Amino acid sequence: MPAQKKTKPTTKGATKSAGAKKTAAPKAAVKPVVKADAGANQKGYETLRGMKDILPKDEKYWLAAYSTASNIAQAYSYGYIETPIVENAKLFIRSIGKGTDVVEKEMYVFDDRDATKVCLRPEATASVVRAYIGHGMQSVPQPVKVWYQGPMFRHDRPQAGRYRQFHQFGCEVIGEKDPVVDAELITVAYNFL
């Protein structure tokens, strides 16, 4: 049911309806009623199950995490990449695997207006590889080292500390086979913690 539009009472002007005389609005202003838990979601304004708002009271924590991720990634010469939140579903079906739980049960998949199956990204690696190939990064000096952060989506069963929309920081190195890259990625992750 759509939320009803709330109107404020006024002390100016008049109201008029068909066949009725003009009457002055009430002179006394109505004081709003504030519930004991003013921070609780009002009916019709709740977040979807498994989703969470980031509020100003939490800003310092989120900005600190973003800043730390950025500083660490840049210290190891990773360049920032941002990929779309919405991708062609085929990208993840191919990269993650058709029979996997992520593809079969957890992806948010829907048809766009052109009848293309699209999804909210469940992870970022496939999108980064798509961008690498799509933008011809294989022709630039290798390896290509990128980092990202942002929201990912999986239709999991929400639990304490586990949401359907979650934020992920990650680093990818493409075009290098030396295992020293694995050691570097472990070091980056360790320094982030």
Placement of each model-derived feature along the sequence:
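TRNA-recognition modules of translation machinery and tRNA-sensing kinases, especially anticodon-binding
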Residues: 2-193
